[in-house]
């Protein structure tokens, strides 16, 4: 793992996690783990069996100490401890919203920080995870977009967010206890900091780990990857991950989308929609989710709603309408509730589900579009953020 440069900030907590000599096993695919064990001295004829045993200890039981892997011989446990570690991101802060939403500020290698959000609901719990430190896309309505990209997360740092949340929620099974089918983390959405498709290989490997049936065991139908429209990677996502897809659409003309989602200048609406029409067939997905943030006077007219319906015609889809979540220095305002409902009504009458997302975690800046590492927030004033947003 390449250590990224440490950036200074206002926190007094030590900025860098201790370096260890062992290779982190978290985030390795089965194939990578198999190779690592052989390189560490595991006889090749035993390696496949050892992969299965270690995999279950880490991802089914949530064990972090090789000494607790009691179906392995003591000398083999010692070999593992000498060569490897089971390391997760460190929780710097945990905030709990009035609505039960939890936001974790997590420290990763190099002293960098990312945010992860857990959203409890009546019959499920959704974990929103990050794929990058910062973001390259500079979407003008998104707080994360005001933080420049520092680096991609490793597969281990992506999987680690899921494991940290399960730790905090006490969701790992206990040996000998009755099996509990209730899942507190039942869904994962790649909608946190960063553009997942600009970190494709690590996201793919992380999702392979999360979906593996002998560990965390989340169905690919319980995982949603959200992209701003990185067209060359969309077919690969269908073929190599196969999860559900959400698209940050947000506008119905190239002129408006160029401003809101600048990557549209590279892959415009027509090009994006052509790629999306193929996704359900390639991935066996039932439908694509179009995410549409409601910005007062920008993209929320009746004509926008009718144009949206025309654009997505023929694509199995639903449209998630997202009331804009304001942040310090934001140049936009949330559409009025009546305007949002009128927009939703037009889309619904055209035959598409058009739920209005209930903002969650606004009081702790955990709502959609509000994520940004606390170190970056502390480094800039509201005036600086506003100036960047106008630029």
UniProtKB/Swiss-Prot annotation:
Keyword terms, alphabetized: 4Fe-4S, Cytoplasm, Disulfide bond, Iron, Iron-sulfur, Metal-binding, Methyltransferase, rRNA processing, S-adenosyl-L-methionine, Transferase, tRNA processing
Location of this chain's protein in the cell: Cytoplasm
Obligatory cofactor(s)? [4Fe-4S] cluster
Q: Which residues are recorded as binding S-adenosyl-L-methionine?
A: 194-195, 226, 248-250, 325
Q: Which residues form the active site?
A: 115 (proton acceptor), 368 (s-methylcysteine intermediate)
Molecular-function GO term, any one: tRNA binding
Major place of localization?
cytoplasm
Q: Which reaction does it catalyse?
A: adenosine(2503) in 23S rRNA + 2 reduced [2Fe-2S]-[ferredoxin] + 2 S-adenosyl-L-methionine = 2-methyladenosine(2503) in 23S rRNA + 5'-deoxyadenosine + L-methionine + 2 oxidized [2Fe-2S]-[ferredoxin] + S-adenosyl-L-homocysteine; adenosine(37) in tRNA + 2 reduced [2Fe-2S]-[ferredoxin] + 2 S-adenosyl-L-methionine = 2-methyladenosine(37) in tRNA + 5'-deoxyadenosine + L-methionine + 2 oxidized [2Fe-2S]-[ferredoxin] + S-adenosyl-L-homocysteine
- What is one Gene Ontology biological process annotated in the Swiss-Prot or TrEMBL record? rRNA base methylation
Q: Which GO terms describe its cellular component?
A: cytoplasm
Q: What class of enzyme is it?
A: transferase
**UniProt cross-references to InterPro entries, sorted A to Z:** Aldolase_TIM, Methyltransferase_A, RlmN_N, RNA_MTrfase_RlmN, rRNA_lsu_MTrfase_RlmN/Cfr, rSAM
Q: Matching HAMAP family, A to Z?
A: RNA_methyltr_RlmN
Function (record text): Specifically methylates position 2 of adenine 2503 in 23S rRNA and position 2 of adenine 37 in tRNAs. m2A2503 modification seems to play a crucial role in the proofreading step occurring at the peptidyl transferase center and thus would serve to optimize ribosomal fidelity.
> What is the recorded name of this protein?
Dual-specificity RNA methyltransferase RlmN
Q: Which organism is this protein's natural source?
A: Paracoccus denitrificans (strain Pd 1222)
The organism's taxonomy opens as: Bacteria, Pseudomonadati, Pseudomonadota, Alphaproteobacteria, Rhodobacterales
The encoding gene: rlmN
């Amino acid at each position: 793992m390449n250590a990224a440069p440490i950036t200074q900030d206002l926190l007094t907590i030590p900025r860098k996690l201790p370096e260890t000599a062992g290779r982190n096993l978290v985030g390795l695919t089965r194939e990578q783990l198999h190779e690592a064990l052989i390189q560490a001295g595991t006889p090749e004829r035993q390696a496949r069996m050892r992969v299965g045993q270690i995999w279950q200890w880490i991802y089914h039981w949530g064990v972090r100490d090789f000494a607790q892997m009691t179906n392995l011989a003591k000398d083999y446990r010692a070999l593992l401890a000498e060569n490897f570690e089971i390391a997760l991101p460190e929780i710097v802060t945990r905030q709990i919203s009035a609505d039960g939403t939890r936001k974790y500020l997590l420290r990763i290698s190099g002293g960098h920080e990312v945010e992860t959000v857990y959203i409890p609901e009546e019959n499920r719990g959704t974990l929103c995870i990050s794929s990058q430190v910062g973001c390259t896309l500079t979407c003008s309505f998104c707080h994360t977009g005001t933080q420049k990209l520092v680096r991609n997360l490793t597969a281990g740092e992506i999987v680690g967010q899921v494991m940290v949340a399960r730790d905090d929620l006490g969701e790992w099974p206990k040996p000998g206890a009755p099996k509990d089918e209730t899942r507190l983390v039942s869904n994962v959405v790649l909608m946190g900091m960063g553009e997942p498709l600009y970190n494709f290989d690590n996201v793919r490997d992380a999702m392979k780990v999360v979906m593996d049936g002998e560990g965390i065991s989340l169905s690919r139908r319980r995982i949603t990857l959200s992209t701003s429209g990185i067209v060359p990677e969309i077919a690969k996502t269908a073929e190599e991950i196969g999860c559900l897809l959400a698209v940050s659409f947000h506008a119905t003309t190239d002129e408006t989308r160029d401003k809101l989602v600048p990557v549209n200048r590279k892959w415009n609406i027509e090009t994006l929609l052509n790629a999306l029409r193929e996704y359900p067939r390639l991935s066996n997905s039932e439908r694509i989710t179009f995410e549409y943030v409601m910005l007062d006077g920008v993209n929320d007219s009746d004509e926008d709603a009718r144009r949206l319906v025309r654009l997505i015609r023929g694509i199995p889809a639903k449209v998630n309408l997202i009331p804009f979540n304001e942040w310090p220095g934001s140049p936009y305002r949330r559409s009025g509730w009546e305007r949002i409902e009128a927009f939703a009504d037009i889309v619904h009458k055209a035959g598409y589900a058009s739920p209005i997302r209930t903002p969650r975690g606004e009081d702790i800046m955990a709502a959609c579009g509000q994520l940004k590492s606390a170190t970056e927030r502390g480094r800039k004033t509201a005036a600086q953020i506003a100036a960047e947003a106008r630029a």
